[in-house]
Amino acid sequence: MAPIFDLLQRRKGRFVLWSPASQSVPRLILGTFKATPSPGAVTTLFTGDLSQTQNGLWELASDTIQPPLQNDKVYHYWFEVDNTYPTSTGSGKIKITDPLAYTVDYRQFADQPRAASMQPPAVIKFRDGKLWPCDIDGTEVERVPDPVQSQVPPNNQMVIYELPASWAKSGPNGKQIDRGTFADVQALFDKATPGVRFSSISAVRKEAIVADLGINALELLPIADSKYQDQWGYSTAHYFAPDADLGSTASLVDLIQTITPSTRLILDTVMAFGHDPYIYAAFMQFHLVALDPDHPNDPLQKFAEPGNADSYTSHNQGPRNPYGGSLWRYIKNPQQTYDPQTGQASLKHPPSWSFHRAHLHRWLLDFGVSGLRLDSINNVANYNFIKYYKDYAWQLHQARGGSTNKFIVIGEELSVPKDLLTSGTLNALWNEPFQGRIRAAIVGEAADGDNFEWTVRKMVDCTLDGYTDGAQAVNYITSHDVEGNRKERLYNFLSNCKVSDIERRAKLAFACFLTAVGIPMIFAGEEFCDQMDLDISEKQSDPVNYERKSDDWRTRVFNYVATLVDLRKNCPALGVDDTSFIHVDQSRGGKIMAWVRGTTNPVVVVANFTDQDTPGAQYFVPNWPDRDRNDWREITQNRAVPAAWVGKEPLMHWEAKVYTCWKAGAVNGQTNGVNGTHSG
């Protein structure tokens, strides 16, 4: 049975505001939304005081409201509170969104710029004497069933697809950029779903492009509600609500039910800073002012706390960055106030710790989430909190009968501190050095002070670089952080390196990437060599252009990648850490190499990192395992290898070949070769 979260339970029959700040009595402002005249507005029906039932907890029972709430009716509401923002002026009162809102409604603001101070009303439905979460049209959404563990891919066989909401399509004046919706994402998995804003794109309307790719874990860039419409959602405002611009909660549930259980949902969460209502309702309890030495005369700076360790990043590498929001406060003395998790009167941790556990509770139990990616751990800068959060995620997962190898908490900390893994603070890290090594290798360079051979060795086997298990390392050629030198999309990187054979190099990169030890993560669009449409400085707006997938050469890259994805997620040899290098050709500068993954029915990769084909009709690779077997296959070309040619096939320049004797069958309760058209 799942743990009870007291604050969330209370909301079923009451309007509840948890605010440990000292303040005057908050008020509920409640009404109904009328769509006409456009853009619509909320008509106020009731204004009344909340009562303090515990220190820091304010409530108003729904059955005490007069006139009585109507059954089966949708209501919109705000809380009116003291404005605690450090530089606030004026009346001292402000209407705020319920910090726990499951749905928010921006319709009354129409096309107004969404300033950080904008507070949309929360939405709730009154039915049978209780308050029910609902969409703005009144639809009540059932929670997603717990993932069926026998059908969930294990961590060591995941292939993650990192998908932003910003997409591009052709318009009358060139490229038109828009945000995809949950329905558009569903269309990438389901041919029967046409999508909404991108139905004009063949890859969205006629194909199930991501299903065809074959990934089995989807990481949508933050889907909790953000006020900003032109970015990827790293400015979370309403942590419990799906992003209103991406669609309704019902459409999110439709998406999840389409992809699960065979595809895992990874939740991307931003907890270094927020744009949430507590900035106004209880600033000093939940937030702190960021240090800004470049603007010492900014009025906010007199409220900054240079003596507080909470103001600095991990390892004191400089001030934390709020990126236009407000930093979450993670260091604060215990308070004799309401604990929203236990319901007791003594809060043992800073309020932000409990707030973040509360929305974690919501997402894991209501949406079947089976993994987390925590953004910018060094900017959160509190490893004790991260472990506290991770431990609760695992408690929730295990309470629903979850398997130990079918849930994961991944952290983004680009200095890759392995102590976060050995201490149990996190399960995995983004393996940032992998990106540098693979990009160096495909242009014939070494990286990180190693020679070329060791650049490739560490790229292929992360256990040579401090990891103790491949499931601790999330590898990527490209991530959504496409800003900076050698971080851009693969197409742009190769173009900037004056590479003319981009298709060949991209295939080489993916052959190494999808056979390496670690969890592979594909940034959306890289599977067909998408390119950047915007200036590199606009990384959180740069769109994915699925129209490009129809280019002939890009379709070839896509099919090549899909073939290897199918192998990666199904072949047992790629789900273990066992790796041995059997050949380094010193006569060619150590740049033709061969390595073996796994022991039983292994995978052998032979790669040529030079601009020269191997000479002669044969290229002999010594130490080839099971050379006498007659069932070797080359995966990327989907062909059998004649027994006389095992370990002897030539290589073209910048080419990798991937061999195995393994054949598709039942593995871990799953049927292999799901994407049969791409299977090797």
Label each PLM-derived region with a short phrase.
Residues 1-14, 55-160, 168-180, 184-187, ...:
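The feature marks proteins involved in alpha-glucan
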Residues 17, 602-609:
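Short, well-ordered beta-strand segments enriched in hydrophobic/aromatic residues
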Residues 19, 643-676, 680:
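C-terminal beta-strand-rich structural cap/linker in extracellular carbohydrate-active enzymes
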Residues 19-25, 625-627:
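Short proline/glycine-enriched turn/loop motifs at strand-loop junctions of beta-rich domains
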Residues 85-148, 281-338, 448-465:
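Core domains of carbohydrate- and sulfate-ester-processing enzymes
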Residues 146, 151-155, 164-367, 377, ...:
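Substrate-binding/active-site clefts of carbohydrate-active enzymes
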Residues 222-224, 232-235, 258-263, 359, ...:
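Active-site-proximal helices and loops of the catalytic beta/alpha 8
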Residues 472-498:
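Active-site clefts of carbohydrate-active enzymes
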